[in-house]
A protein has these predicted regions:
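Membrane-embedded beta-strands that build the outer-membrane beta-barrel scaffold
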Residues: 1-2, 118-137, 169-177, 181-189, ...
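A surface-exposed, glycine/aromatic-enriched loop/edge motif typical of exported proteins
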Residues: 2-90, 177, 188-229, 272-303, ...
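Short sequence motifs at beta-strands and strand-loop junctions characteristic
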Residues: 110-114, 123, 161-165, 247-251, ...
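Short, solvent-exposed micro-motifs at the edges of structured domains
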Residues: 41-43, 47, 51, 71, ...
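Extracellular loop and loop/strand-boundary signature of outer-membrane beta-barrel proteins
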Residues: 104-108, 154-159, 172, 241-245, ...
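Structural signature of Gram-negative outer-membrane beta-barrels, strongest in the C-terminal barrel
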Residues: 174, 182-188, 250-251, 325, ...
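Catalytic cores of eukaryotic secretory-pathway lumenal/extracellular enzymes that build
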Residues: 141, 356-401, 652, 657-673, ...
Length: 862
């Protein structure tokens, strides 16, 4: 099977610099210019470029300012002689607005897909049993114009390739041992080799030609093959070459065996499963650096960009790593038919689930106070496999994972009375209930995200807002951070008997960007339960009503273990509170070395792990979730038509919907909210109708026979709107580290009516944006991460089918398929509403699902 598609991908509405802002005129955004010059060094740089005196603490602009004695930029205009060289050059890669004053949108750049699949199956009936050999091959290539999942751009010009090949081979044997006894055996091997996010657009432009410095104060190019337009994240868009390209080869060997024995009234099953996994990764994760610009200095992100004042700079380095995993599971169950109308199922499953380990022990964790014996010069707390009490899996593999499952099915029957109306006679209805525990293996991502952590790698995160051209120099006071790149890593034969002391930990302190795996983690599990009633209304109609629920326990979550002390940072946030020449504390500066006005030196304002650590997070099994749903279906199956109607009313709550969402270190339940995937109401109808052209025209031939219409109709409420505040005004410093796409911060909400609007055609926002505001400095926003919903779905997919029978064994089928048949604008999706309070598009519906798509298909059967 081969697939070739070329489809334009819409960017949605993106806020870009207006024509006035591209010339340095910010009078239209003057209200956002609330910042002050953060230090004496920056004041000196500005003075040199502007030709007039600028002082630390001076406002960049105040309302009505027209004199250089009152503000840095009179008239809210930034002259070009003060622009940074990188900003001047990179401005050419940012698209100009094409939809209003500061909006950009296009679908002119396509995603191209080539996907080729092939399979082969051979069956043989032998004295060994029914043997089946199956082989499957999938070779694909995708050119994505907006590779945002790889940290890539959301504007045109920076596409990336993802390509690879999957192969699966399985051998199965079903052997019967007399009546009622069967054994099923399966063994297989899966190989998945792929390259993810290989940059294509934006290459061939050196960092030096863009204006970035080299040497100790600049960016060391560690991946010259991917050197190109520098990656920069703004509140509303990302530009530049993708930063998380990798080559990944996965191998899985699996086998299972199930033995079944039927002896009335019991059906017994025993069996087991085993799989062995390899994940071999060769990443290029931020090897050439990335900037985050949020408006930390002036209050306006694009003004900061022109001035060359990013919020932070990140660069990583690391070696290939090779993850390993084993799983073993055994089970036994009995289906006991107690009576003809009553069945009881019970079973028990035992699972031995291991966290991933690394072939060369290139993993680590943090235990306060512990000193590594494998790396004796490591900072206290940083330990690795081989250190006392630290297994290769970091957390122990526990053998006590027993999971019971219970179920009952009862078919009541009554011949008369009110119960007959409800349940009908025997066989017309059924009542089912079940309960089960299900353990969940740790994802490979839990180990993979520990890549680029000392001593096996390093992620540099600027301790204070730096300069764009020289990102290892602090903008506020000119302090030069040590540039550790390139890094020499330890050999693979390090052990307690062969310790290693040559890694220079002093060059990577404070250690930041470390999402370490907690050494006391438990295996996550869920408790699932359901109760259902099924009633046959007519011989062709079946009604089902169910309650379905589950609870997740010991779920893996990410939480900061070294957050900033908000009160301390706030007390050091004003120039009068610090010594002359010292930087102040503020957003993204929680790791700065600050000297107070009383000459007390603070090596950052973080609490928990000490000054040797910056922003680090723990992956801990401390989260939970809850899901409850009412599910109803109505099924009709007739001679010429059929339909299935389904409605679900549900609610899902969790503390984090994925590893990219942090938990609140001050209150673990503080992030508990509706899940990112929660869908309150969901109605789906699928149907098929034989078109009676033969009866209408009273002719039965190839022209009138074989016509049918099928389709799927869906009406549902939208997904929740996720709220963010990327300003770090909370002063917690919960910065991104490779898995956290956003900070913990959320806006403030004043409790006013939300005024939900799901139709952007009326020009209104999706909700009342006036009810929200950026965080107050030193305080975490009070808005829940998610508590209301965006636009829903109103969609029809239709298929017109014509079957032509050529002979008894040959037929030709024609299909006309229409997706979103009525071309209804679907403002639906997890990111359809902008929830970033600092983005000018905050509260706007910025994207829509695909428009109508028509597809013709022909199938020849023989």
């Amino acid at each position: 099977q081969g697939t070739r598609t070329t489809e334009g991908v819409p960017t949605g509405l993106i806020t870009v610099p207006s024509a006035q802002e591209r010339s340095g005129d910010f009078l239209g955004q003057a209200s956002s210019l609330t910042g002050k010059v953060s230090g004496t060094y920056l004041a000196s740089l500005l003075s040199q470029k502007l030709g007039y005196a600028v002082s630390a603490g001076e406002p960049y602009y105040t309302t009505g300012c027209s004199s250089t004695s009152a503000c840095v930029f009179p008239g809210a205009t930034i002259p070009q002689n003060v622009w940074s060289t990188p900003a001047t050059n990179l401005l050419n890669y940012i698209p100009a607005p094409n939809s209003g004053v500061d909006q950009f949108s296009t679908s002119a750049f396509p995603e191209t897909v080539r996907d080729d699949k092939a399979s082969r199956r051979v069956d043989a009936n032998t004295h060994w049993g029914q043997l089946s050999l199956y082989y499957f091959l999938d070779n694909y290539r995708v050119d994505n114009p907006y590779p945002q999942q790889q940290g890539g751009a959301s504007i045109p010009g920076f596409d990336a390739l993802t390509y690879g090949q999957a192969q699966l081979i399985t051998l199965s044997d079903a052997k019967a041992f007399g009546s009622g006894t069967v054994n099923d055996f399966h063994i297989g091997f899966l190989r998945y080799a792929n390259v993810i996010g290989q940059p294509q657009g934006g290459l061939g432009v050196s960092l030096a030609s863009q204006g970035f410095a080299s040497g100790p104060t600049g960016i060391v190019v560690q991946a010259p093959q991917f050197e190109g337009v520098e990656n920069i994240a703004f509140p509303s868009f990302v530009m530049g070459v993708p930063i998380t390209n990798e080559t990944q080869n996965n191998n899985t060997l699996f086998l299972s065996d199930t033995f079944s024995k039927v002896f009335s009234p019991h059906t017994l099953k025993f069996g087991g499963q085993f799989h062995w996994d390899q994940v071999n990764e060769h990443p290029n994760a931020t090897f050439n650096g990335t900037f985050n610009i949020t408006g930390t200095q002036t209050g306006n992100a694009f003004a900061d960009f022109l001035l060359g004042l990013p919020s932070n700079f990140t660069q990583s380095s690391g070696e290939p790593f090779y993850l390993r995993d084993r799983y073993t599971g055994l089970f036994a169950q009995d289906s006991w038919r107690i009576r003809h109308d009553l069945i009881f199922n019970f079973g028990l499953r035992w699972e031995y689930i291991m966290p991933f380990w690394e072939k060369y022990n290139q993993l680590q964790t943090i235990i306060p106070g512990r000193q590594s014996v494998v790396y004796p010069n490591a900072p206290a707390g940083l330990v690795v496999p081989g250190d006392p009490g630290i297994p290769s899996t970091i957390a122990p593999s526990k053998p006590d994972n027993f999971a019971p499952r219970l179920g009952v099915a009862y078919s009541p029957g009554f011949d008369h009375g009110i119960l007959n109306k409800i349940f009908g006679t025997s066989g017309n209805s059924s009542i089912r209930a079940s309960y089960g525990m299900f353990y969940t293996a740790f994802p490979g991502l839990s180990a993979g995200i520990m890549y680029a952590v000392p001593p096996f790698g390093y992620t540099y995160l600027s301790s204070t807002p730096p300069l764009l051209a020289t990102p290892f120099i602090s903008a506020a006071n000119g302090t030069q951070a040590g540039n550790p790149f390139p890094i020499t890593f330890p050999p693979h034969n390090v052990s307690p008997s062969n310790p290693y002391t040559s890694f220079d930990f002093s060059s990577v302190i404070p250690i930041s960007g470390d999402p370490y795996f907690y050494y006391r983690n438990d295996v996550p599990y869920t408790e699932n339960y359901m109760f259902s009633f099924e009633r046959q209304i007519t011989p062709h109609t079946l009604l089902t009503m169910s309650y379905v629920g589950n609870q997740g326990h010991h779920l893996l979550g990410v939480v900061s273990t070294n957050p900033g002390d908000q009160a301390l940072c706030l007390s050091l946030s004003q120039p009068s509170a610090v010594a002359p020449g010292s930087p102040t504390c503020g957003p993204f500066a929680e790791d700065a070395v600050i000297t107070s006005s009383t000459r007390q030196v603070y090596r950052g304002t973080r609490v928990g792990l000490g000054p040797n650590y910056g922003e680090v997070t723990a992956q801990e099994t401390i989260a939970n979730s809850n899901y409850d749903a009412l599910e109803t279906t109505l099924r009709y199956t007739g001679r010429r038509s059929s339909f299935l109607l389904g409605y679900t009313y549900s609610k899902s709550i969790d503390q984090a919907s994925n590893l990219g969402e942090q938990l609140n270190p001050l209150d673990l339940r503080g992030t508990r909210a509706i899940s990112a995937f929660d869908m309150k109401h969901n109605f789906v109808a699928s149907y098929q109708l034989a078109l009676p052209f033969d009866q209408l025209f009273r002719r039965n031939n190839r022209l009138t026979d074989g016509w049918s219409l099928a389709g799927t109709t869906r009406f549902s409420t939208g997904l929740p709107v996720t709220l963010y505040d990327d300003s770090d005004n909370s002063l917690l410093g919960t910065l991104g580290n490779g898995i956290n796409n956003n900070l913990l911060d959320t806006p403030d909400y004043d409790g006013a009516p939300l005024e939900i609007n799901t139709n952007p055609r009326n020009g209104k926002s999706a909700f009342n944006v006036a009810a929200f505001s950026p965080e107050t400095l030193g305080h975490l926003g009070n808005a829940s991460r998610r508590f209301f919903y965006g636009p829903g779905i109103n969609n029809f997919d239709l298929t017109l089918n014509k079957l032509v029978r050529l002979t008894e064994s040959k037929s030709l089928e024609f299909r006309l398929e229409a997706f979103n048949a009525f071309n209804h604008a679907q403002f639906y999706g997890p990111a359809s509403v902008d929830g970033e309070v600092n983005d000018p598009n905050f509260g706007r519906i910025v994207s829509a699902a695909s428009p109508r798509l028509l597809q013709l298909a022909t199938k020849f059967s023989f």
